[in-house]
Amino acid sequence: MGNLPPWVIGVLAGLASSTLYAAASGGATPAIVLLYLSPLPIFIAGLGWGSMMALIAGGTGLVLTSLFNGISSGVVYLAVEVAAPLWLMRLALTSRAVGGRGASAAARAARAREAHHRAVAAGEIDGPPDDLPEPEVTWYPPGLLVVWTTAIAASLLLISILSMTVTENGLRGAIMQMINTGIVDTGELGRVLDARGFDISPRAFLAGIASFVPAMAASLWLIMTLANMMVAQLILVRLGRAARPTPSIAELRYPKLFLAIFPASLLFAFLPGEAGFAGASLAAVLFIPYFLLGLATIHAISRRWQARSAALTGFYTALVLLSPLVAVLVGCLGLADAWMGLRERYAPDLEVA
């Protein structure tokens, strides 16, 4: 890719993103995975070649999706797959030189150094390439990137719930209608539940599922958006194109105000009706950052362990095999770290940022 003009990389990234999105729109359940991978090419373009290339990628994907899938599909693609990555990458590429020389100082220095290298290669300037050391800069904190991603996921969730309050039974009723494709009326679901020994009516079972779907969808979007950003960064590091250094998960930290929102949402969960439904759904989404904080605590404290690699391998194996239980325990560890400062106690040499 090094010989391609940057705008071509942006166009190719947009083409790849729109192709993944179109493949996921086919309706097959396994293809849904492609929907969550759709922002990955845009993240690669932005974190490797700058925000303008991400904008070109997003614009290309929007045009192609609108042309082949319709304007409404293009609007959804823009809102869910493009807007958030563009904003998150703009934040991720923000840096400030130590000493106050202004924002994005590292990016400006990198562009100047690259221009100097091109001039030397073209014979416009005599002498070797400029090998001045990188300026000392501070980058946008990873914790704030998680906060912004969580805020976007929570906003999409609340908009979905509020927009359906005028309909009968709200968002849960709409989801029940969508997943009830005759399986209740034909008695098929009832037979399956009876065969498995569940003492619950088919409609009550569907109502329970409908209550979990919004929070599950928002949580999965949050996790996959952060995962796409991380995977894009790892790919770019391997290619030598990463525009910023890779942050350490052990140094993750959130603002105190953000930490207070989770207990507030738990209080709303006890309210009746749609308010309680919104509070419970929001609490589920806001628990994800605490899960990440729990991972940060484990990585920080384990730095002193002699068999750290084996311990982390065993932990992540347990996380995969016993996913829900271990995830909840890790989230509780994150809660304890947020309010009790476990990393400051057991990893005092760690610079938490």
Language-model-detected regions and their locations in the chain:
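Transmembrane alpha-helical segments in integral membrane proteins
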Residues: V213-G240
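Membrane-interface interhelical loops and short interface/amphipathic helices
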Residues: G100-W139, V146-T149, A153-A210
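Hydrophobic alpha-helical transmembrane segments
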Residues: W7-L15, L55-G59, G74-A79, L145-V146, ...
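Long, positively charged, glycine-interspersed low-complexity recognition regions
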Residues: P272-A353
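Hydrophobic transmembrane alpha-helices
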Residues: M1-A57, Q306-V320, L325
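Alpha-helical membrane segments and adjacent membrane-interface helices in multi-pass membrane proteins
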Residues: P30-R90, L333-M340
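Membrane-water interface at loop-to-transmembrane-helix junctions
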Residues: P135-G143, A204-S219, R244-A264
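Small-residue-rich helix-loop
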Residues: V237-A296
